[in-house]
Curated annotation (Swiss-Prot):
Protein location: Cytoplasm
Annotated protein name in UniProt: Acetylglutamate kinase
Function: Catalyzes the ATP-dependent phosphorylation of N-acetyl-L-glutamate.
Annotated catalysed reactions: N-acetyl-L-glutamate + ATP = N-acetyl-L-glutamyl 5-phosphate + ADP
Length: 248
């Protein structure tokens, strides 16, 4: 297992990051963790599609991505969301590096269902050697885009991308930032769950539809070797940890 932490940040969260976020990143970096941040850009994409009067359609939470929407997605992620996050981290004197799939074919993907989703894909390969070399000296800031083997760009769900990266890079920890402090049951944040317990809470609708994709991503990470997957609204807060075994 690599001393690596993979963090997923939504586009909305980029403008709302607190000082404690940067302090925690700095602390992990000083502790010699390699850090990879996968960022979304939903609000930035929505702003562009609205300005150009393009329709927005989603299927099972995935943005249907036609050719025009794909261009705007690349523009929003690589020209707006990523530079904004890089600027904030640089202001806190952190050594950062903006990354995307075209950097030595870092991320390879394939279409999920072109007829239903357009240019939406899943990751099929990660250039592990190149990426880990880059992370040896920098905090990586990676956009959730992939390239097919023939060079076609794909829009990839950021939670799914972060999960696959954590799996492929043998990360110690996956942190999925969201807008709630964790999985809430009877008014309290549940500190830890096993994958089996989490699935039961999904079946009984304790974990609602909006949270389910993140929980499923966390479960997938744990079941493929990631030691801990955390769902939280702040990286310095414990949130809910999905772990292999939970003490009774």
């Amino acid at each position: 297992m690599t001393k690596l932490i993979v963090i997923k940040i939504g586009g909305q969260a980029i403008s709302q990051l607190s000082t404690t976020f940067f302090d925690q990143i700095a602390q992990w970096y000083q502790q010699h963790y390699q850090i990879l941040i996968v960022h979304g850009g939903g609000p930035m994409i929505n702003r562009l599609t609205t300005q150009l009067a393009l329709p927005v359609h989603k299927v099972n939470g995935l943005r249907v991505t036609d050719a025009a929407t794909l261009v705007l997605t690349k523009l929003a992620l690589l020209g707006d969301a990523q530079p904004a996050l890089l600027a904030k981290l640089t202001q806190h004197h952190l050594p950062v590096l903006g990354l995307n799939a075209a950097d030595n074919q870092l991320l390879t993907g394939e279409l999920i269902d072109y007829r239903q989703l357009g240019y939406v894909g899943r990751l099929t390969a990660v250039n592990q050697v190149q990426l880990m070399q880059l992370l040896a000296h920098h905090i990586g800031i990676l956009a959730p885009l992939a390239l097919t083997e023939t060079g076609q760009w794909l829009n990839v769900n950021a939670d799914m991308a972060a999960t696959v990266l954590a799996q492929q890079l043998h990360a110690e920890k996956l942190v999925l930032l969201t807008d709630v402090p964790g999985i809430i049951h009877h008014g309290n944040v549940m500190t830890s769950l096993s994958p089996q317990q989490a699935q039961q809470l999904i079946r009984t609708a304790v974990i609602t539809a909006g949270m389910q994709p993140k929980v499923q991503a966390a479960i997938a990470a744990i079941q493929t070797g990631v030691k801990q997957a955390i769902i939280t609204n702040a990286i310095d807060q414990p949130g809910t940890a999905i772990i292999q075994e939970v003490a009774v």
